[in-house]
Each structure stands twice: as C-alpha cells, then as structure tokens.
Amino acid sequence: MLKVVLLMMIMMLASQSEAQLNRDFYKESCPSLFLVVRRVVKRAVAREPRMGASLLRLFFHDCFVNGCDGSLLLDDTPSFLGEKTSGPSNNSVRGFEVIDKIKFKVEKMCPGIVSCADILAITARDSVLLLGGPGWSVKLGRRDSTTANFAAANSGVIPPPITTLSNLINRFKAQGLSTRDMVALSGAHTIGRAQCVTFRNRIYNASNIDTSFAISKRRNCPATSGSGDNKKANLDVRSPDRFDHGFYKQLLSKKGLLTSDQVLFNNGPTDSLVIAYSHNLNAFYRDFARAMIKMGDISPLTGSNGQIRQNCRRPN
C-alpha cells in the first residue's frame, strides 16, 4: 500500500511540473527568444551540419540524468564534478560553445529570464528542423540546477552503445518513455557520427551484420583496442546530414552501426516499429516529435526550484 501511495505522489508531482511548462512561457518576458536561438543554430549547422546532431544529443544526455535541468552544461567546480567527463559524455557530447553563444545573446536581450535548460530544448528542436526533420511545440519554463551529478551520469541511466534491447526498453521506461518512444527517439541516429571505439566490437564480432558493410567500416576502424578509437563513421550511410528515415532502412539491411541500434531489428518485439518507420516517414516524424515533447517533460525544475543561470557553465 505504501508503494502505491508513493508512486501516486511521484506521478502527481511530475504532472504538476509538466503543467507549469508551456510554449508561451517567455511570450511577454522575452518575445524574440525563438528568433535569436534559431539564428545562432542555423549559422552553426550551416557551418557544420554534424553540429545539429550534437545539439540534439546534448538535450538527450541532459534530460536522462536527473531530468531536463541544464546540469550537463556545468563545468567542474571545487564542490562537484560536472557530467561532461562522465563515461557516457566524455569525448562524446559537444556543442557547448553554441549554447554559450545563444546564452550570451539572450542575456543581453532578456537578462536573468531564460534558463539554459530551456535553451537546450529549443536548440534540439531547431537542429532537427534545420536538417529537414519535423518540428514540434517546445514547452518552456524549466529552471536550471545549481549542481551536476557525476555519479548519476555514470550509473547507467544513459544506455551504452553496446547494450541489449531489454536494457534499452527498461532505461527509457524508467524515464517515463514507452518502447515506441524509445524506437522513435533512436531515429535521431539518422544524423551524426560515432567513434570507432563504440562500434569496433560489432563490425568485427557480430553475426547480425551485413558482411560488406562490416568490411567497409573496418577500413577506418582497426581491430586493436586503442588504435584509431576516435576515428568516426556516419551513423546513416546514405544521408548522414539529413533528418529522414534512412536509419531504419539500414537496420532492415543489418547495417546498423551500433549494437544498440541493430537490436531494434533483430527478431524482437520492436521489429514491427522499425519496419513501419522505414516505410512511413510521416509516422516516424509524428512519433519522434511526440517523444521529444515527452522527453522534455522529464523532471523539470519549475517555480522557485533551481535558478536562471547567467552563465550556463557555472551556478550563479
């Protein structure tokens, strides 16, 4: 009985936090916010299309560790270790300088008003749009955490690139996201790149991989650990800089670069979703947008909780 009561209390608190988020949160206090963010992101993505994937990844990593609170952006301080150097994020997340540039411009225009957590949410949406993907209404009103959680970032809440389908399902379920949400959000791998160290085991040892695909990837990813670890390969071979459904088509051909990608189509319960998204771009776009909105609702700080950081890299 106690467990049921506690669960109901958690659900009530979550729904209250979500209710405080809305698209028009800055309509009066910072009306040009969306325009300023879009301009900076557009310039960054035009200069380097891969940056769109990086900015989207920042939002995912932030939300999965203690909620969408901007904690990922914090540098180390004497009192805590930041999340940037945690296992899942070290040498993986990037784009912080783009967020810094947006924050600088927004602070000049609307000082002390817009949170870094909300800037992450908007940049994720704009990055997808600028690379040809779907748009969605970004709910705003998050506040920033005053600390980071290095231990939580290393606790497995962010699934590793070598993982099982059941672990993926469970990790997303723990965040309030369904299996459908997980498969749709995995479609973000239709853009971006991965380092050799994350897919070496798959291209040399996996059985559920297209042989010619594996051989082609081995040319730039030596079998020896420590050799060429940081060399990169596109997650989507055909259209790496366009947000489409090519990722799912690759899975049907056993050409998923990461183990955590190919497990989505490997004679399991998510096969039907992969097939559906590979055939229907609009269905993928619809479910991806819905899942992004749900992900943005993960444990936000609202009301008087947290703060509005003046600099995204450090607490006030």
From Swiss-Prot:
Catalytic residues identified in the record: 61 (proton acceptor)
Single Gene Ontology BP annotation: hydrogen peroxide catabolic process
A Pfam family reported for this protein in Swiss-Prot or TrEMBL: peroxidase
Note: There are 73 peroxidase genes in A.thaliana.
Secretion signal span: 1-19
Protein's organism: Arabidopsis thaliana (Mouse-ear cress)
Function of the molecule: Removal of H(2)O(2), oxidation of toxic reductants, biosynthesis and degradation of lignin, suberization, auxin catabolism, response to environmental stresses such as wounding, pathogen attack and oxidative stress. These functions might be dependent on each isozyme/isoform in each plant tissue.
Cofactor(s) in the UniProt record: heme b; Ca(2+)
Enzyme Commission designation: 1.11.1.7
Protein name as annotated: Peroxidase 67
Site (Transition state stabilizer): 57
Gene coding for it: PER67
Keywords: Calcium, Disulfide bond, Glycoprotein, Heme, Hydrogen peroxide, Iron, Metal-binding, Oxidoreductase, Peroxidase, Pyrrolidone carboxylic acid, Secreted, Signal
Disulfide bonds: 30-110, 63-68, 116-312, 196-221
Positions with a binding annotation for Ca(2+) 2: 190, 236, 239, 244
Family: Belongs to the peroxidase family. Classical plant (class III) peroxidase subfamily.
Predominant cellular place of this UniProt entry's protein: secreted
Residues modified as Pyrrolidone carboxylic acid: 20
